[in-house]
Amino acid sequence: MADRISTGELGRRPGQGRVNLLLVGDATRYFLAGSMQKFFPSTAQITLTISNVKKVAVLLAANSFDIIFLKVTSTLTAEEQEAAKLIRSGKKKNTHLLFAFVIPERLKGYVSEYGADISFSEPLTLEKVNTVIHYWKTYFTNTDMENTELPPECRLYFQTSRSELGGRFSTDMFLCSELLKNDARLGLKAPLSSLDKSKQASFLHSTKEKLRRERIKSCCEQLRTLLPYVKGRKSDVASVIEATVDYVKQVRESLSPAIMAQVTEAIQNNRRFSKRQMPIELFLPFSATSQREDAMLTSAFSPVQEIQLLADRGLNVYSMTAAGGALEGAVRGQPGSVSESSIEDLYKTRVPSTARSLNSFHSVKYTSGTVSPHEAAARTNQNISTYLPPTAPSVSNFIPQHCNAMLCPARPTSPNCLCTPGHELAASSRAASASIFRGFRAASASDHQASQPPALPSPQPHDSSYF
């Protein structure tokens, strides 16, 4: 049935002949590339884009995808949960988007809340990918879904219970239930036993507790950098919290009621501090530049195993028949011009069906920007060094992220660009916090000087004080 669909029916618009796929996470690209070439006609143009979970929002806003594969880790971090929610919200705008969720075996049965159309447990085999493609071509490529009535056995059900589907699918997904329940390739099984449910609940509880402790640890590390340096002060969590309480009390006493009202209003307007917690914005490392060699790596092995996709880049794949049986071909990435309006530079390639080759890349390491005198003063008496982990994958793996004009705070050609080698990481958050408190003290001092006579000098703090 699937191979009868013409090129005009592929994608979201008739006659488009193009399929856009997004792989979020460390997806199994070998199976996907081989399945794309096998199941789609030779005239179909396939665009594969690989990205991490941090750039899902940017990619969804700038592009329209047909199939999105989200592969999560065994810990199911907050960033991955946020990416799943973004993809789910994107399905409301693009009804022809298929969301495939690839989860570890230990998390099987606990993905219904993320609204995935199809969920698979690892490993992601070629058979599972083919099932996803067949399902998308059957139910997501109709260009006039609003005016077309599906047969009764394939209607869309929005209120199917979890127990009926073995807890593998969402209750509000686009689902042809009769077909899916009779399709053994989807791996639908009976509901989990009470022992398995208990193990899964215990694992999820420990995962949430681990995330909570990581949040506490991250906040304490930020407090250590924001607090004034005191020689001999303990650095454990309890001591840092106690020192923070004392410091906040001193700051509140030094601020005028008008400024305190402004601070209170700003905190109340911040949705992060509301009862309904928003996802934490985790640290996004700066992009890194890379250098390309002119040499090429050629091979005559299986085309499925030789296709290597670049991190955060796209590949346009054309299925072609090798002329004369010669085992030659090339996958040559062409870097796009960097501009402020560009969001993702796509590498477009022509891929023959018999051989592949890939340009080699140098491994790069993260660098940082210069430290201004103002920021250096904010770090006075502090001996803190910050290092970003180097990224040095092999040629056959993903390369580090490239410097992008939209993601880099400065132009790549500027000497102040944070992606330029030879600079240090700027402690912007620490300097900004110090400048805020200094601004509060200055404003408070001006209010008191205008309305009150000069006050007596304040007594010096005792030796036992933290400050």
Curated annotation (Swiss-Prot):
Tissue and organ distribution: Preferentially expressed in the adult ovary and testis. Expressed in the majority of spermatogonia in adult animals, but not in the most undifferentiated spermatogonial population.
Source organism, top-level taxon: Eukaryota
Disruption-associated phenotype: Knockout mice are infertile. Infertility could not be rescued by SOHLH1 or SOHLH2 transgene expression due to a lack of expression of either genes in rescued animals.
Sequence ranges assigned to domain bHLH in this UniProt record: 200-251
Main subcellular location of this protein, as a coarse class: nucleus
Keywords recorded for this protein, A-Z: Cytoplasm, Developmental protein, Differentiation, DNA-binding, Nucleus, Oogenesis, Spermatogenesis, Transcription, Transcription regulation
Residue ranges, compositional bias (Low complexity): 443-453
CDD domains: bHLH_SOHLH1_2
Region annotation (Disordered) ranges: 443-467
Sequence intervals crossing the membrane: none
Induction text: Up-regulated in mice lacking Sohlh1.
GO molecular function, one term: RNA polymerase II transcription regulatory region sequence-specific DNA binding
Record-level GO cellular component terms: cytoplasm; nucleus
Assembly information from the UniProt record: Forms both hetero- and homodimers with SOHLH1.
Biological role: Transcription regulator of both male and female germline differentiation. Suppresses genes involved in spermatogonial stem cells maintenance, and induces genes important for spermatogonial differentiation. Coordinates oocyte differentiation without affecting meiosis I.
PANTHER family registered for this protein in UniProt: SPERMATOGENESIS- AND OOGENESIS-SPECIFIC BASIC HELIX-LOOP-HELIX-CONTAINING PROTEIN 1, TRANSCRIPTION FACTOR-LIKE 5 PROTEIN
UniProt protein name: Spermatogenesis- and oogenesis-specific basic helix-loop-helix-containing protein 2
Species: Mus musculus
Recorded name of the encoding gene: Sohlh2
